[in-house]
């Protein structure tokens, strides 16, 4: 999205709903919700649209994600046409974001429920640049722990009257700790044949990457990190930002290209896992085998 929410600018289903929660920021001890099992721990911020803001092995207290602002999370973000809006004094576009806007205003959390191994959020997003609550948009998120894998389901409904042009859409945007520097994927033409993986350290701004096996990962110096698999998505965008003061991050987003048009509903599934790249690839290969 943006420098903060994804696509960088050099100028930069149905669970039962609960009563809407207040728009005011929760107290710190009420803001976070964590789920964990014997493999991993995942955390959500109510003040950021219920988006995923924490991920680690269960025996670690080191967050592998970056949540420096309301754009840096694992979250939904979509793009429409330029609309005269300004992000930090630079031209921007129609951009509903699950977490909130660039000035720190939270999205409106309509529902947030959880069990021991799952969580659901329903959110009215904000326009990243203007901060307007976009009542014509609804974002939903279902998260489920499945052993060493996190299953994520996202759904976006756009009831606006304007038809926007086609854009690259983040599915989803994912911001990671800057220590995870190396981007790893398979980018050749023989997927799931144990072919050699490609490795790179992205720069700034966005680089576009083929991911023929529909997964991509960032790893640290120890070769371990976070991988994401989005079925049928074969392209991603990535960058690393180094701005200091906690803003350093590694970013990646699998990409689909489509337009926001009246009464659009777009839903997709993604999977996360932790480990070295061989383990990450093997776990995603098992998911592929299970698919019809």
Predicted regions and their residues:
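Bacterial N-terminal signal peptides
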Residues: 1-8
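Boundary at the C-terminal end of the N-terminal hydrophobic targeting segment
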Residues: 8-9, 14
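Beta-strand-rich recognition/accessory modules
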Residues: 15-40, 47-48, 62, 68, ...
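Solvent-exposed N-terminal domain segments of exported/luminal and surface proteins
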Residues: 31-107
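Residues within well-ordered beta-strands of beta-sheet-rich folds
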Residues: 34-36, 43, 120-122, 142, ...
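Acidic (Asp/Glu-rich), glycine- and aromatic
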Residues: 56, 137, 146-189
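Extended, loop-rich substrate-binding clefts of extracytoplasmic carbohydrate-active enzymes
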Residues: 84-147, 161-163
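Active-site/ligand-binding surface loops and adjacent short beta/alpha elements
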Residues: 171-174, 179-242, 250
